[in-house]
């Protein structure tokens, strides 16, 4: 926990004065709201996170959770990386410097930032609400 807090403070100090409206948070309870107002997401890459990011159309830097079984999060992150909507930093390679460089590469290039978000949105599942509604209707019958 102290290491995590120290990293958070280091990142905050680097960006707090150079980029407007930066928020560095240890945990987010209102994820949907934060995703919608964010320009760039730095996060793990679980299947739901990938889906949510594609729906809101945001660029991302993924730090996949290392796994003993098949590196699922890394595979998930590769889906968006391969189409140009995300970057990946493996957990074993994460440093403040590396993360800072990746953030700078994206956030300081407004065209890349916008393009990555648009690309992410191209793989968003469509008609999700309708599909859920139809499934519920089938179950209730």
Question: What do the predicted segments below correspond to?
Answer:
Residues 125-141:
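C-terminal alpha-helical cap of glycosyltransferases
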Residues 43, 50, 59-70:
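Short hydrophobic beta-strand element within catalytic cores of glycosyltransferases
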Residues 12-26:
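Nucleotide-activated donor-binding/catalytic signature segment of Leloir-type glycosyltransferases, i.e.
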Residues 1-13:
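Single conserved hydrophobic/aromatic residue that forms the stacking wall/gate
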Residues 28, 36-51:
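Acidic donor-binding loop of glycosyltransferase active sites
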Residues 36-38, 54-63:
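Conserved donor-binding/catalytic loop of nucleotide-activated donor transferases
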Residues 105, 112-126:
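A short, well-ordered alpha-helix in the C-terminal region of glycosyltransferases
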């Amino acid at each position: 926990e102290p290491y995590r807090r120290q990293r958070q403070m280091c990142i905050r100090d680097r960006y707090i004065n150079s980029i407007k409206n930066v928020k560095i948070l240890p945990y987010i309870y209102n994820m949907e709201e934060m995703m919608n107002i964010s320009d760039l997401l730095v996060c793990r890459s679980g299947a739901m996170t990938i889906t949510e990011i594609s729906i809101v159309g945001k660029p991302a830097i993924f730090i996949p959770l290392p796994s003993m079984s098949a590196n699922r999060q890394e595979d998930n992150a590769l889906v968006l990386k391969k189409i140009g909507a995300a970057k990946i930093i493996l957990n074993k390679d994460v440093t403040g410097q590396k993360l800072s460089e990746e953030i700078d590469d994206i956030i300081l290039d407004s065209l890349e930032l916008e393009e990555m978000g648009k690309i992410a949105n191209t793989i968003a599942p469509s008609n999700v609400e309708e599909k859920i509604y139809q499934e519920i209707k089938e179950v209730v019958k």
